[in-house]
Amino acid sequence: ANDLPDAGDDDGPNGEVPAAYGWRRRWARQGVICDELSVSALALNLPASGEGLTSGVVFNHRRCGEPVRLTLRQLGDAKLEVPPGTLVRICENPSVLAHAATTLEGEAAPLVCVEGQPNSAVLALLNLLAADGAEFAYHGDFDWGGLRIATTVIERYGAEPWRFGVADYLAAAPAGTLLLDPPGAGATAPWAPGLVEAMTAHNVAIHEEQVLDDLLADLVEGERQN
């Protein structure tokens, strides 16, 4: 039992694969094949220029303005080689990426969708982009789960908030119809002091689909919106 692989490695965004991927690889070396295909990352228009299969897949999807879904297996040894300083926007919900692909096609700015709490494939993709020198801007749902996801991404990758502050919530709150549950003791938004208090006071959730026009405008203009 002492020889079993350890799943608890603390891998960071500096080019390393996330712990779950390294764990699968260590099992594989002992003859136990773990699933590298059931988790994937969704992206649009990443400016990859590296050699290899995965970079080529990303490049060709960008030429057509089409979303690409990459498995953990594809990402494990990939080198995307996006230009340093590339701003990659990150959203929580695939509907944002789908609308960007449909309406903007190849004109949309680079976008990654975490589809909830980031899985090991999403972390692997973001690690590769971070290692290439990409910068990140994050938007998610204004609800308690959305804040937890945002905290993970913003703290791990130093992402800028993208229309995800107090003023953005207050501007959208009048359109809110879904009531929030009580926030609980752990609710926090370190990048936006006062956001938890504003959400608690107004007691409505604002999901990305409700501010989709603003997000799409940023994606076509390529401008930073904090």
List each language-model region with its residue ranges.
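Nucleic-acid enzyme cleavage-core boundary/entry regions
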Residues: 1-113, 118-131, 145, 155-160, ...
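Catalytic cores of secreted/periplasmic or lumenal enzymes
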Residues: 165-166
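Acidic beta-strand-to-loop metal/phosphate-binding motif
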Residues: 133-143
